Swiss-Prot record:
GO CC annotation, single: MLL1 complex
Domain of life: Eukaryota
Residue span of region Binding to corepressors: 1-62
Chain span(s) of sequence motif DEF box: 95-129
Cellular localisation: Nucleus
Annotated protein name in UniProt: Transcription factor E2F6
DNA-binding region boundaries: 50-129
Region described as Transcription repression: 173-272
Region (Dimerization) location: 130-222
Protein's job: Inhibitor of E2F-dependent transcription. Binds DNA cooperatively with DP proteins through the E2 recognition site, 5'-TTTC[CG]CGC-3'. Has a preference for the 5'-TTTCCCGC-3' E2F recognition site. E2F6 lacks the transcriptional activation and pocket protein binding domains. Appears to regulate a subset of E2F-dependent genes whose products are required for entry into the cell cycle but not for normal cell cycle progression. Represses expression of some meiosis-specific genes, including SLC25A31/ANT4.
Molecular-function GO terms, alphabetical: DNA binding; DNA-binding transcription factor activity; DNA-binding transcription repressor activity, RNA polymerase II-specific; protein dimerization activity; RNA polymerase II cis-regulatory region sequence-specific DNA binding; sequence-specific DNA binding
Species assigned in the record: Mus musculus (Mouse)
Region named Leucine-zipper: 143-164
Amino acid sequence: MSQQRTARRQPSLLVDPAQETVRRRCRDPINVENLLPSKIRINLEENVQYVSMRKALKVKRPRFDVSLVYLTRKFMDLVRSAPGGILDLNKVATKLGVRKRRVYDITNVLDGIELVEKKSKNHIRWIGSDLNNFGAAPQQKKLQAELSDLSAMEDALDELIKDCAQQLLELTDDKENERLAYVTYQDIHGIQAFHEQIVIAVKAPEETRLDVPAPREDSITVHIRSTKGPIDVYLCEVEQNHSNGKTNDGIGASPSKSSHPQCPEKEDEPPQ
């Protein structure tokens, strides 16, 4: 009998307690019927919860969350929002979730460079520059002001362009103005920019296409194409102001023998 007990295998230290309990109960023929699946499941679930709880206790905060740089940034945020720059160090330690010793590490450095002063044992006051304008150099402020002025000017120009476009649309769509949509030779002659220039007036229907290729040294080519009617082209010779009748290029300018187009009658279609 003693030999049978000695030959019995001792449970290993690495065996799960829940599994060993099940194994021992299974060896006893009397308790096999009383062993229910629910009991096995309960034991396993309790074991898993125990292991998960142990792992949760071992979780540590990230190193960056407790670093001095991170705490200093949070401390400066509290200084920026504090009335009068006065802080209670006990409340600071509570908000930062660290020991008061870590807060003293920050305040001692700031006190050494004369950015804070101690009001009492647990209170300090910020005496440095205004944190709301921290980092805003004068040049940056100047550029921001110029940018604001340019933005306002751009908005004003956009409104003017929009207003001019609306007025032009109303002018061209008005039936009363359609019969007066023409210019005379005297109108062209009165424009100073057209003096000593060759002016060509084109009267064409809607959707006429005009292409001007890159000009050459001695000539300019213009292509006009229309699919809705004929195209009328007028050469408007602007008179020269020189008494000798010569242009700036030294070429003689003879007066035009053709009659200049005058103001058309109402029934005629005016040139565009």
